[in-house]
């Protein structure tokens, strides 16, 4: 349009037209290439730009740092640090975590690990690995064999407890010398220290027990004279209604210990009918109780509070023993007329903690103070295994000479320590006058081998009886062993471990591994018998609850009523 005008012929017009055409061409080229690039990116995967954007977003949002605090023993700090801190530096370089140690207490330090979670986790794993490569320590201890047997017994419960608590390896060698066993502890220093501490506690407990037993042996006096022991044991009835129940605390503690038991022979009727006390903490408790009973019942005023006016068979009472003038717990087995004075009565008593019996006048018997029932009865009836009487026609009747020899060898009631091991059992004769559940059930009697630990050897008492002509072997196959025969320390039987669940013949030998006991039935029988005593005493207290009675706060009226009703009250001691 401007081309035909005078302006169209000017150079300015031509310049403007050239710039315009170039600009239009450039714009068209840009639009073309832009469209082509978009189409190519769409064909080759148009999601790539979005991925790139997400990656940039994640990189812009770093992980949050965390700090983990662990506690390490001072003895492990050198392992973590390394020479000049080289270990920590190496771990920090590998994991990009930061590690700092600071004091916690005298024996430990805090180890703070900071960084991103993955780095902290990796650093912790490397630190634990360094701690676990602590040098292995081996320690050997010499302990008494009885303690080693205790640790290794009861299915190894105590041994497993030490292993699990310390994470150390423990091995026990019972075949040591001079009555010692060797315990080997293997682990790092911390594990060994923990195991050693737990073993030291057991050693201290065992030494305390030995000291207590030595004190008992020094303080105990002979309970009866040898000249009187035969008559008393042979001619008193000794058919206790409750003596079949072993002391439950000792039974539960030693069940399955797998070792011979230390015992005192406390009373003897014959080699096939005698009583033992298990040596242990209860021995000292028994002596303390006898001392307290003697002190209490020696007072005429106290005896007046516990007058026995209506005795009954099966009642647990307090009675004075004429030989030593001490007071003991006893059970009334029978009440009968005095053969020298039919108008008077005589009471046949079984001393539940010792096993012997006496005929005693009711005047020398009192009702038992209730708190004296707390300790379990200590006498355990046994028979000597593998022997029989020299009287062929009456194998259960023993000559007085044989009984006297057996009393001499066992030092009955003179508190000589013997070793007993259960090797068999037989059914107990059922008592026709029994009122306790245990007697009605006819619990089995343990047959034991007795050993005298003298002159660094253990003499088998049954063998001595046979070789000296005071007994015969139970059968021809019985081997008379050396006089220094030693009971196996690996035996799994104890005096308490009797099997009452399976039918048996009257005399059934069993391997030590098969000996066990129905604890619940025996415990229930003894509890029922004690409950009967408490029920009787509660009735005497006019229906008052024994548990709620404070003897120190009884009024004069209460005491007067108690005496009128023969109540069994306590003076200055709590009833249980």
From Swiss-Prot:
The keyword Endoplasmic reticulum appears for this protein: no
Q: Low complexity compositional bias: what residue ranges? A: 232-243, 561-576
| Positions of the UniProt region annotated as Disordered | 40-60, 209-253, 556-576
State any GO BP term from the record: transposable element silencing
Q: Which InterPro entries match?
A: KH_dom, KH_dom_type_1, KH_dom_type_1_sf, SNase_OB-fold_sf, TDRD2-like_tudor, Tudor, Tudor_domain_containing
Which effects follow disruption of this gene?
A: RNAi-mediated knockdown does not produce a visible phenotype. However, fertility is reduced with egg-laying decreased by 30%. AGO3 protein levels are decreased and AGO3 is delocalized from the nuage. No effect on nuage morphology and no mislocalization of piwi and aub. RNAi-mediated knockdown in germline tissues results in delocalization of AGO3 from the nuage.
Stretches with biased composition (Basic and acidic residues): 209-224
Example GO CC term: the record gives: protein-containing complex
* Tissues expressing the protein: Ovaries (at protein level). Expressed in the ovary and testis.
Family annotation (SMART domains): KH, TUDOR
Q: Does the keyword Nucleus apply?
A: yes
Q: Which CDD domains match?
A: KH-I, Tudor_TDRD2
- Domain remarks in the Swiss-Prot or TrEMBL record: The Tudor domain is sufficient for binding to the N-terminus (1-14) of both unmethylated piwi or piwi symmetrically dimethylated at 'Arg-10'. However, it may not be sufficient for binding to symmetrically dimethylated AGO3, instead this interaction may require a larger region of the C-terminus which includes the Tudor domain (257-576).
- Describe the subunit structure: Interacts (via C-terminus) with AGO3 (via the N-terminal region when symmetrically methylated on arginine residues); this interaction is RNA-independent and may be required for AGO3 localization to the nuage. Interacts (via Tudor domain) with piwi (via N-terminus). Interacts with tral and me31B.
Q: What does it do?
A: Involved in the piwi-interacting RNA (piRNA) metabolic process, which mediates the repression of transposable elements during meiosis by forming complexes composed of piRNAs and Piwi proteins, and governs the methylation and subsequent repression of transposons which is essential for germline integrity. Likely to act by recruiting Piwi proteins such as AGO3 and piwi to the piRNA biogenesis machinery in the nuage. Required for the final steps of primary piRNA biogenesis by participating in the 3' end-trimming of piwi-bound intermediates into mature piRNAs.
What is the name attached to this protein's record?
Answer: Tudor and KH domain-containing protein homolog
Instruction: Please report the organism this UniProt entry assigns to the protein.
Output: Drosophila melanogaster (Fruit fly)
What would be the name of the gene that encodes this protein? Answer: papi
